[in-house]
């Protein structure tokens, strides 16, 4: 039932109008399709992405023939073979975009062959909840020019009983922020992920977000909490070892730790992602010691879903949370190993989209299967709401099993 009979690779468009890789896998009784997303703010240690057209052309002769006849339900075997064919430690041979599309499509085909959803195929009987949505409301940094310095101002409905209600609340915060900007006479377009990208300072963004959260929390009757993705590697100047802000402020690594800790206290942030340079394990650790008891200190560029880097972070005490992006590491098995390592050491995990997304909903299934605390996949835009709507459906199925 799960033996691979045919594989198709094609180029499709992502949400930024760029070409990416989509894979289709057909088994005797199953079908799976998956697409590779792409990032704008990428860590220097991420798995290598190749030009989609060239990668697909090479894969036709170098990859696909080796996968025909393999058992798609043997995920470890599939992913080990992808590594073997590639022959590098970062998928620079076949391309991480080809690898992740094939790996996920294989898993979906195996699930389809046994007539169960992907989240159940991977998570089995242990799945009893869905991750809460971590939504991007105001954006800047690499996602939008002439906007905020920090890349993302986020919200998460920490007080909602059902994830469905949290998804709707995030959308209401998004709309309320627009209304507050309009009231102030501030025009705002949208960034790559659908967040508002107004020409305002970071302090003003914090104030507007706090006001919107208060209004929507009162309306919904449950708590909504703020967070940020600082994407601090983009602020860091390697030559001087300092963080340089657009307003002329220059902060040392120690000052950056103090600044972020003060923001956590001032605005009751419950989630801070990439607050320091992606090689600064000690700086992360200092912030984690200072604020990790009241806030998730999350590494994205620091860890890039890589077990070696996560282990390094564990040895330093650098963070209490790991962002998980399957395309950063290349396969479902590698993704699972990263999550397992983090959880074994008491760290939370957050499954995440990329700025360049497709309508693929796989991460909604992975977030449930691996019991991640949050799913970071935007608030609006078809490629974002596809995942959120799938999460609503999955949550219904989980409740039906209870």
Curated annotation (Swiss-Prot):
The keyword Magnesium applies. Binds a second Mg(2+) ion via substrate during catalysis. It catalyses: (2R)-2-phosphoglycerate = phosphoenolpyruvate + H2O. It is an enzyme of class 4 (lyase). It comes from the Archaea. Its main location: cytoplasm. PROSITE patterns: ENOLASE. It is found in: Cytoplasm; Secreted; Cell surface. Pfam families: Enolase_C, Enolase_N. Pathway: Carbohydrate degradation; glycolysis; pyruvate from D-glyceraldehyde 3-phosphate: step 4/5. Keywords: Cytoplasm, Glycolysis, Lyase, Magnesium, Metal-binding, Secreted. The keyword Transit peptide does not apply. Its cofactor is Mg(2+). Its EC number is 4.2.1.11. Mg(2+) binds at residues 229, 273, 300. Belongs to the enolase family. HAMAP family: Enolase. Catalyzes the reversible conversion of 2-phosphoglycerate (2-PG) into phosphoenolpyruvate (PEP). It is essential for the degradation of carbohydrates via glycolysis. This is Enolase 3. It comes from Methanospirillum hungatei JF-1 (strain ATCC 27890 / DSM 864 / NBRC 100397 / JF-1). The lineage of its organism: Archaea, Methanobacteriati, Methanobacteriota, Stenosarchaea group, Methanomicrobia. The gene is eno3.
């Amino acid at each position: 039932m799960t033996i691979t009979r045919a594989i198709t690779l094609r180029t499709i468009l992502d949400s930024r109008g760029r070409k990416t890789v989509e894979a289709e896998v057909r088994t005797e009784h199953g079908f799976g399709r998956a697409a590779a997303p792409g990032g704008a703010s990428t860590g220097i240690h991420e798995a290598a992405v190749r030009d989609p057209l060239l990668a697909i052309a090479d894969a036709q002769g170098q990859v696909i023939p080796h996968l025909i006849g393999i058992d798609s339900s043997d995920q470890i075997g599939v992913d080990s073979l992808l590594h073997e064919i590639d022959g590098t430690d970062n998928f620079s041979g076949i391309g991480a975009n080809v690898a992740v599309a094939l790996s996920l499509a294989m898993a979906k085909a195996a699930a389809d062959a046994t007539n169960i959803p992907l989240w159940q195929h991977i998570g089995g009987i242990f799945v009893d909840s869905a991750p809460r949505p971590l939504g991007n409301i105001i954006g800047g940094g690499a996602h939008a020019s002439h906007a905020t310095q920090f890349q993302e101002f986020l919200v998460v409905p920490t007080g909602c009983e059902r994830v469905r209600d949290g998804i709707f609340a995030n959308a209401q915060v998004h709309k309320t922020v627009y209304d507050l900007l309009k009231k102030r006479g501030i025009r705002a377009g949208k960034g790559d992920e659908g967040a508002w990208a107004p020409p305002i300072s970071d302090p003003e963004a914090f104030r507007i977000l706090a006001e919107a959260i208060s209004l929507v929390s009162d309306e919904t009757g449950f708590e909504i909490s703020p967070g940020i993705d600082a994407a601090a590697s983009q602020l860091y100047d390697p030559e001087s070892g300092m963080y340089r802000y657009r307003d002329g402020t220059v902060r040392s690594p120690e000052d950056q730790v103090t600044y972020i800790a003060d923001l956590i206290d001032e605005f009751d942030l419950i989630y801070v992602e990439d607050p320091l340079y992606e090689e600064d394990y000690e700086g992360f650790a200092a912030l984690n010691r200072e604020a990790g008891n009241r806030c998730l200190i999350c590494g994205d560029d620091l860890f890039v879903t890589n077990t070696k880097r996560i282990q390094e972070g564990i040895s330093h005490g650098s963070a209490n949370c790991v962002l998980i992006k399957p395309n950063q590491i290349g396969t479902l098995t590698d993704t699972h190993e990263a999550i397992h390592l983090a959880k074994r050491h008491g760290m939370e995990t957050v499954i995440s989209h990329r700025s360049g997304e497709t309508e693929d909903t796989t991460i909604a299934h992975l977030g449930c299967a691996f019991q991640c605390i949050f799913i970071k996949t935007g608030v609006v835009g078809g490629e974002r709401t596809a995942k959120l709507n799938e999460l609503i459906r999955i949550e219904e199925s989980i409740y039906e099993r209870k």
